[in-house]
């Protein structure tokens, strides 16, 4: 198995990213797909694109995908409150999402105080070394949803994670999500105005979390997210 990652940017501003884990015979088509995504993206044409291919030498940890909850009227405040995220922490998370800084990874905040707990600056924390396996083989999930669900499932695979809020920084995509192990994966429609680049990924955690161990799991442990509906 091989890990394939793509990142593209323009003048050091993030444009697009993608990754997966695949067999050797799928490398060529995956690289072509990531190349197309990186170079022909609505956020603009990059002046830098990097594709990294690395053989997986460790056992791959299987993670059960979060359940997708279909609720057109999902309310972010109610969802976060149900998961133990305070209003103060949510407001601080939205401040990071709406500021002008384009973060390339997630920001980890205390679910109680909203204080930032990681020290990775604009880089943030990156959930990497993962793939998504749809056991249903129905093809009913598009690439955007499978990528989001895979990341959300990895991020929430820890008992001290209260939940994750994600708002895409793509110009015309205005749907975000809130996800947690407790309540599943909820899409949030019209969470931002169209034609805006603001966005981000916020992870709300219990202050007792072993941050170094958690970050190592997200960034270094090979993971396969398995999606299967009943």
From Swiss-Prot:
First-tier enzyme category under EC: ligase
Pathway field: Metabolic intermediate metabolism; pimeloyl-CoA biosynthesis; pimeloyl-CoA from pimelate: step 1/1
KW Aminoacyl-tRNA synthetase (keyword) present: no
Catalytic activity: heptanedioate + ATP + CoA = 6-carboxyhexanoyl-CoA + AMP + diphosphate
Keywords recorded for this protein, A-Z: ATP-binding, Biotin biosynthesis, Ligase, Magnesium, Nucleotide-binding
Keyword Kinase: no
Any one GO molecular-function label of the UniProt entry: magnesium ion binding
EC number(s) per entry: 6.2.1.14
Family to which the UniProt record says this protein belongs: Belongs to the BioW family.
Function: Catalyzes the transformation of pimelate into pimeloyl-CoA with concomitant hydrolysis of ATP to AMP.
Subunit structure: Homodimer.
Protein name: 6-carboxyhexanoate--CoA ligase
Organism: Staphylococcus aureus (strain bovine RF122 / ET3-1)
């Amino acid at each position: 198995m091989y890990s394939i990652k793509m990142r593209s940017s323009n003048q050091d501003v993030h444009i697009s990213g993608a990754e997966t884990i695949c067999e050797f015979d799928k490398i060529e088509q995956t690289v072509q797909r990531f190349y197309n995504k990186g170079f022909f993206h609505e956020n603009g044409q990059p002046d830098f694109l990097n594709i990294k291919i690395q053989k997986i030498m460790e056992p791959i940890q299987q993670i059960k995908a979060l359940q997708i909850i279909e609720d057109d009227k999902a309310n972010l405040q109610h969802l976060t409150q149900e998961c133990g995220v305070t209003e103060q922490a949510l407001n601080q998370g939205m401040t990071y999402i709406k500021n002008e800084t384009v973060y390339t990874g997630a920001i980890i905040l205390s679910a109680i105080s909203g204080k930032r707990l990681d020290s990775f600056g604009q880089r943030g924390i990156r959930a990497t070394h993962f793939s998504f396996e749809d056991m249903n083989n129905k093809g009913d999930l598009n690439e955007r949803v499978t990528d989001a669900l895979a990341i959300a499932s990895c991020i929430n695979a820890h008992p001290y994670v209260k939940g994750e809020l994600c708002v895409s920084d793509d110009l015309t995509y205005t749907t975000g999500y809130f996800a947690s192990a407790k309540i599943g994966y909820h899409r949030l429609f019209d969470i931002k105005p169209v034609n805006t680049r603001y966005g981000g990924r916020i992870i709300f955690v219990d202050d007792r979390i072993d941050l170094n161990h958690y970050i190592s799991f997200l960034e270094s442990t090979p993971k396969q997210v398995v999606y299967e509906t009943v």
